[in-house]
Amino acid sequence: MAKTSNNTKTVENTIPDEVSIETVETKPLSMEEKIMLKNLANWMVGFNKIESNGEVNINAGGSIRVPRAEVISQYENGNKLLRGDGDGTHATIYIDDKATRDYLDITSELIDKNKVKKIFAINGLDDFRNEIYKTFTTQAEKVLLIKIIRECGFNDFNKIRECEVLCGMTV
């Protein structure tokens, strides 16, 4: 800002004396580190390994730890169990490691009891219907929805009926 007095002009310094720069150190991902994979399906799933010999099998609703390099290789080679519809949404196997999900640009959320409770909290049957049709598209997700409804004991007939119509199963 400029001030004038007695025909002289003084200028105040508006530049800060110290500029603080935050540096965030990012460590490279360790490809040998084992990360958690969760099977969202109500049946056993598996795939052949790319990085080494053998296969990975995950029991229904179970989880297993697999080297990050194997998971990234499977994802980049188009494993539908991990990729779902192509970008990680609607996948049968959930990658439960934030660093790996960020590396692969996966933004989908885990479908669990909390997510279903949030969906059941939606007011209005039309909005609820739109959300369940958008969220639960694969057979594994539909079976999971019915299972969670049974476990949580929801008591909204119209919403439960809508889920039954979508899934083709009864609660």
What is each residue range found by the language model?
Residues 110-171:
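Charge/polar-rich, low-complexity and marginally structured segments
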Residues 1-7:
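Arg/Lys-rich low-complexity patches in intrinsically disordered regions that function as generic
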Residues 7-26:
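N-terminal intrinsically disordered, low-complexity tails
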Residues 20-109:
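Compact, well-ordered interaction domains used in eukaryotic information-processing assemblies
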